[in-house]
Amino acid sequence: YDMNLLWNAEEDIRSLKSLILFGVRGMAAYAHHAMMLGYADEEVNRFFAKALFAVGEDWGMDALLPIVMEVGEKNLKCMALLDKANTETYGTPTPVTVPLTVEKGPFIVITGHDLHDLKLLLEQTEGKGVNIYTHGEMLPAHGYPELKKYAHLKGNFGTAWQNQQREFADIPAPVSYTHLTLPTKLEV
């Protein structure tokens, strides 16, 4: 698809198609996370094709607006699927107090919202003397019983994903990006 067709389209059409693209993009991340845990929904999966097809067509607002609304409906369904996948895999989360200080010693920061990647990192670093700190959207991981049982999941570092460049600039540790990455200063 020639994206210039979208970017040069009339403002309302461009806006509706952008809503579809950005909504499907986020939904794809949630669907992928659920799929990594063995959960999928065929209705959600089929909708990806329908939504992307709509972006490629020369449709007016009357045809695109229902697709935009359906993006919201399918996103809600996809979030419910991911919630089911996460709770059935990692347990029902409960509110917890999460330390915001970093202990002395080696550590890794993990950012994004892929709990499966966090679980793999926790398994690989268990007993190695390396502490793990969440960042941004990974913060809720501390509430899941199957994740908080790891003693080296120590706390949360920093704030939200859009502050990655500033917050990661001088930390003496590697960062594992699972999603929502901004280019570092060296990449800009």
Enumerate the predicted regions with their spans.
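Substrate-binding cleft of carbohydrate-active enzyme catalytic domains
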Residues: A173-S176
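Catalytic micro-motifs at enzyme active sites that drive phosphoryl/nucleotidyl and oxygen chemistry
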Residues: T97, Q162-Q165
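Acidic, Ser/Thr-rich peripheral helices and adjacent loops at domain boundaries
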Residues: K148-N163
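Conserved small/polar residues in nucleotide/adenosyl-binding loops
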Residues: T178-T184
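Short, low-complexity, polar/charged sequence segments that are solvent-exposed and flexible
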Residues: G127-V130, A151-K154, T181
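Catalytic cofactor-binding cores of redox enzymes
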Residues: Y1-Y144, A169
